[in-house]
Amino acid sequence: MSVQNYSIVIDLRWCLDELLVDKVIDQRGYNLVITSRRDKAQHPLLTISEFGLPNGHAPDNSADNKLTLAWLNQWLAAKAGMPLVRIDPLKVDVPAVTQLMSFEYARLQHILPIEVSLDEVVIGTDQPFYTDWQANIDKLIKSKSYRTVYLSPEQINRYRREFYQVTQAIAGANSVHKRAAADVTNVEALLQLGDNTNPDANDQHIVRVVDWL
């Protein structure tokens, strides 16, 4: 099934259909997953991996032939023709990637910037066939080019939340620092005013307050 000319958010049925066509799962496994209760907000690969279905592509003599999230990530990335990338949070310039777009925009578009250089932005996604966001991305990254990579839904959910929380914490700390600096400046101005031997009439009440302090 070719979906490269369409923009779609893949769901559980789409993934199961493709896995069945690719002979990764059988009809029994398909029926088990599709008829079970599930969290519809969860990424379909996470849901499928929880069932531990036999992997039809695993070698016959393999000790572990279960369908894992790691294998499913490789399968979907290959189907989309995207490189599979694993985030190393220590190598990500968090302020740089989060300033490109809001958390809510990144969440709704199923994306996360993970690298920013002088001329390029690397954008990760766990929905490789959803491309609606590409129509507006040039407005966000300005003159830079971009390339898209596939991220595990487990990683993108975790680090999207953590990166933006870090940015909010930094912004909050900077705000507190600026307020403290402003308070110090105001106090210094008052003290200097208190030393003025010929204050303006409008400032005399402030001088009295400073002298009282």
Model-derived segments and spans:
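N-terminal, intrinsically disordered, highly charged
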Residues: 1-213
